[in-house]
Amino acid sequence: MEKINLNEYLAANEYPGRGIAVAKASDGRQMFIGYFIMGRSENSRNRVFDPVPERGGICTMAADPAKLEDPSLIIYNPVLTLGKTHIVTNGDQTDTIFDEMSRGKSFADALRTRTFEPDEPNYTPRISAVVYADGSYQMSILKSADGNGESVQRYFFDYPQPVAGEGRFISTYKHNGNPIPSFEGEPLRFACPRTIGDFAHDLWKIGRAHV
């Protein structure tokens, strides 16, 4: 798979939804993990990230509690840390992975208990990643079979020996639409920025461009 320029890819995509990017720094000594959220409805757009230091993660919360209509599917922990393992997802499956791995189960075991989100007709995919202490990582997407709400398809991607200077990106959606088409194929391969600051800045810049 050819490497993409993640900035250009996201800038040209009107609505990728929620996205996860995992990369190995060019020096091979650090792993970068990024997560972003976008929303189309007022309820979806009414949220911000808040730290959860006691669990080594972050949660989403309403930017304006008075405007919160339905907390299901939009209020959750996108990031949690279990020992030296970092979990990032686009929904409450973060807690499922955390709980099941705490019991000795695997990333895949945990996600086999879950399915896509019940937001007909989009059936938003559940995207997840787990990054281990040795730098290896796994990603997953749980999605409907071309919009069939009675059929789940679970995909898992394993990166035991990531290459320095590159990463993988997955999002909930392929692009905007009605209904919104789910992401297709394996996570996209992209060139990693030089520093974590550049990595974070690039994702923030793209997110702000779509506001």
Located regions from the model:
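Conserved short alpha-helical segments that host acidic/polar catalytic motifs at enzyme active sites
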Residues: M1-H210
